[in-house]
UniProtKB/Swiss-Prot annotation:
Belongs to the methylthiotransferase family. MiaB subfamily. It is found in: Cytoplasm. It comes from Paraburkholderia phymatum (strain DSM 17167 / CIP 108236 / LMG 21445 / STM815) (Burkholderia phymatum). PROSITE patterns: MTTASE_N, MTTASE_RADICAL, RADICAL_SAM, TRAM. The gene is miaB. PANTHER family: CDK5 REGULATORY SUBUNIT-ASSOCIATED PROTEIN 1 (PTHR43020), MITOCHONDRIAL TRNA METHYLTHIOTRANSFERASE CDK5RAP1 (PTHR43020:SF2). Catalyzes the methylthiolation of N6-(dimethylallyl)adenosine (i(6)A), leading to the formation of 2-methylthio-N6-(dimethylallyl)adenosine (ms(2)i(6)A) at position 37 in tRNAs that read codons beginning with uridine. Residues 143-377 form the Radical SAM core domain. One of its GO terms (molecular function) is metal ion binding. The lineage of its organism: Bacteria, Pseudomonadati, Pseudomonadota, Betaproteobacteria, Burkholderiales. It is an enzyme of class 2 (transferase). SMART domains: Elp3. This is tRNA-2-methylthio-N(6)-dimethylallyladenosine synthase. InterPro entries: Elp3/MiaA/NifB-like_rSAM, Methylthiotransferase, Methylthiotransferase_CS, Methylthiotransferase_N, Methylthiotransferase_N_sf, MiaB_methiolase, rSAM, rSAM_horseshoe. Gene3D superfamilies: Methylthiotransferase, N-terminal domain (3.40.50.12160), tm_1862 like domain (3.80.30.20). Its EC number is 2.8.4.3.
Amino acid sequence: MTKKVYVKTFGCQMNEYDSDKMVDVLGAAEGLVKTDTPEDADVILFNTCSVREKAQEKVFSDLGRVRELKEANPNLLIGVGGCVASQEGASIVARAPYVDLVFGPQTLHRLPQMIDQRRASGRPQVDITFPEIEKFDHLPPARIDGPSAFVSIMEGCSKYCSYCVVPYTRGEEVSRPLDDVLTEIAGLADQGVREVTLLGQNVNAYRGAMTLGATEIADFATLIEYVADIPGIERIRYTTSHPKEFTQRLIDTYAKVPKLVSHLHLPVQHGSDRILMAMKRGYTVLEYKSVIRKLRAIRPDLSLSTDMIVGFPGETEEDFDKMMQLVHDMSYDTSFSFIYSPRPGTPAANLQDDTPREVKLRRLQHLQATIEENVQRISQAMVGKVERILVERPARKDPNELAGRTENNRVVNFPAPVETHARLIGQMIDVKIVHAYPHSLRGELVMVHDTAPATH
C-alpha cells in the first residue's frame, strides 16, 4: 500500500517552494505520495513561519489537533520544519513530545535520514543547522505541476532589519551557482514550464559563482539575462527584493529583457523616514521613490506591490500619514500589510510600544481599504483591453472555463470548449478583458499568440 505525506505550509513563497521539495525528497527516498488529508497520512509535516506571532502559535494549535492521530497510530511520524523549527529547535519536542522530527529550512533534504534515525533509535530527531547551500545538491528533480514554477536562487538574508527574525532562522545570504540555477530552469522548460519565479529572501543580493568553484561572479541582472535565453521560458518573475540593493544594472534589465514581467513586488515597509531608520531598512522614502521613478520611465505600465508594517514602536499619526501619502504616490496594486508583531531576539522587540492596539487596527483598516480601492481602480481600467495571459489550469468554479494570469499577476477566467483545454493550458494567449470582479477578471479569447506582446 502506498504511503502518504501531508504537508501544511505557513508563510511565504519560499516556504511553498520548500514544502514542494519536502514532498519530492520523500517521494524519491521513501516512495511517499502527497495527500491533502492528514487522516490518510503516514507522515505529517508542518512547514512553519515565524515572521508573525499569530502564525507561530497556530503551528502549536495544529500540532494539538494531530496529536490524537498519533495516539491512534503510533507509527505516524509528525515533523515540524521551517523558521519556527529553526528558532525553537528542541523546545518544540519539549512542548509537544509527540513530535518526531524538527528540521530547519536548510536541512529539509536530510528528512529521509532523520526518519531512518527516528525509527532506529525511537527518539525524536532535531537538525536545525545551517549547512549553507548543501540542500540543493541533494534534491531530486522537481515535479511539474502546471506551466509555472518557483526556483530558489539563494538562501537567507544579511540585512538584519530590526524587526525581522529571518537572518536568525534562515541564516545569512548564500547564493546558488549560476549554472545550477540555469540547469534547473532548463530542465523545467523541457517539461513544459513557461514561467519561472526566482525566489529568495533578497534576490537582488544574488551573487552566484558562474560555475561551482569559479571566482567569476554573476549578479542578479546577469542571472535574469541568462534565464531569458533559455528556450521555452516566456516569462520571468522574482520575489522578494530589497530597495537598498536595487541597482542601476537591475533597472536597466527592464529595458533589455522583455520576458521580465512589468510587475514588481518591492517591500517598502513604511512611508516615514524616521520609522524606516528605526527598522534599519537602509534607505529613505525618496530613495525608494527614485527606484520606482526610474523603473516606470522604462516600463510606464509597471504594476507595483509591497509589504507594509503598521504600528511599529513609536509610530505617530504623522508617521502614518506619510505612509498613506506614499500609498497615494506609488499607486500600489497590492499590499501585504500587517500590524507589527514583536519577534523574540530581534532588536525591535526591546523598543517601547505605547500605541494602543485599537489605534493600530484603525490605521491598518484605513491602509487596507485604500489599497483595495487602488486594486479595483486598476482592475476596472483593464476592462476593454487585450491582455497577454499564461493559461495555467481549469477555472476553479467552472470546469468549462480556463484560468491564467496577466503580467500584473491578476487571475483571468475565460470560457473555452473543453476539448481545447489540454491544448491551451501552458500557452500564452491574448484575451480581451470584459469584466472586473473584486479579485479576478473575466476575459474572452482573442488569439493563441506566443511571441508578440499583447496590444493595449
